[in-house]
Amino acid sequence: MDILSNIFGPDKEGLRRSHVKNLVSIALADGHLSEDEWELLVYLASRLGMEEEEINAIRENPEAVKFVMPKTHDQRVQQIEDLVLLMTIDHDINPNEVELCKKISLKLDVLPQIVDDIITGRSQE
């Protein structure tokens, strides 16, 4: 079973929206949203059971979405992996994206070094 299917407990809607808010933030951190980023964002959100309409609502009003902490370390790491995947999909890693990803990592109670480790791992694939 996909870890994203298990990532959410009782407040699964809040967790989904929180994760998608973080994804949208990363996608927009460099000042533009590429087609590749949008397609991946829609795909990742659809895996969480969200429609484009919901993504757009979060994008238009991110302040309405509260941060919700995933319950397990594995779930938090999975979210960071999604963020890095989105950040690297356009092959243009912007320092603002990396900085924001590390801030989100800290908020998720995961050492920010993981962001560099995942980027390095992806570049070696």
Can you describe what each PLM-predicted range is?
Residues M1-I26, H32-E125:
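Small-residue-enriched hydrophobic alpha-helices in membranes
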